[in-house]
């Protein structure tokens, strides 16, 4: 990502995503280049509710939540491409995942960097390549498929 860098703070993210505590997993957008990619940040705190049970003696962020954080970053990229006509009534559905791999654990105190690049859009389905990193090392990667629907429509 190089040309026009857009960054978004939590206040703007809250206007674009319907997620709220405890499932909002993007704290800031560091770079966003419409039609290309996004680089976002999740600060992983010991205060996250999932650490109570995963795992009490060795807290590790669940892999599915890393994937959810990547999907939320992809949603922010999608909404930069196509502004919803009715943002209050628009939902972003995660409809598929391919090639998910987990390479290292994510622990309290880590900064999870979420890199998502646009691959293609066909028949209402967005496809992205997504990589989550900690300290420059890959923590997780996957191809994500998503769609945008109104809240009253079935996914």
Swiss-Prot record:
Family annotation (Gene3D superfamilies): Hotdog Thioesterase
UniProt keywords, alphabetically: Cytoplasm, Lipid A biosynthesis, Lipid biosynthesis, Lipid metabolism, Lyase
Cross-referenced InterPro entries: FabA_FabZ, FabZ, HotDog_dom_sf
Active site: residue positions: 54
Catalytic activity: a (3R)-hydroxyacyl-[ACP] = a (2E)-enoyl-[ACP] + H2O
Cellular compartments annotated: Cytoplasm
GO BP annotations, alphabetical order: fatty acid biosynthetic process; lipid A biosynthetic process
GO molecular function, one term: (3R)-hydroxyacyl-[acyl-carrier-protein] dehydratase activity
GO cellular component, one term: membrane
EC number(s) stated in the UniProt entry for this protein: 4.2.1.59
Its job: Involved in unsaturated fatty acids biosynthesis. Catalyzes the dehydration of short chain beta-hydroxyacyl-ACPs and long chain saturated and unsaturated beta-hydroxyacyl-ACPs.
Family to which this protein belongs: Belongs to the thioester dehydratase family. FabZ subfamily.
Protein's recorded name: 3-hydroxyacyl-[acyl-carrier-protein] dehydratase FabZ
């Amino acid at each position: 990502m190089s040309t026009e860098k857009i960054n978004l703070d939590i206040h703007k993210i809250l206007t674009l995503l319907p997620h709220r505590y405890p499932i909002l997993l993007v704290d800031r957008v560091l770079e966003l280049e419409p039609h290309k990619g996004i680089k976002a940040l999740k600060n992983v705190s010991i205060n996250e509710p999932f650490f109570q049970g995963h795992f009490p003696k060795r807290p590790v962020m669940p892999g599915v939540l890393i994937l959810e954080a990547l999907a939320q970053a992809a949603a922010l990229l999608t909404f930069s491409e196509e502004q919803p006509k009715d943002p209050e009534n628009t939902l972003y559905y995660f409809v598929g995942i391919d090639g998910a791999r987990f390479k290292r654990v994510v622990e309290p105190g880590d900064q999870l960097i979420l890199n998502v690049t646009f691959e293609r859009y066909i028949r209402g389905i967005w496809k992205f390549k997504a990589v989550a990193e900690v300290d420059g090392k890959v923590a997780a990667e996957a191809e994500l498929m998503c769609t945008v629907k109104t809240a009253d429509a079935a996914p």
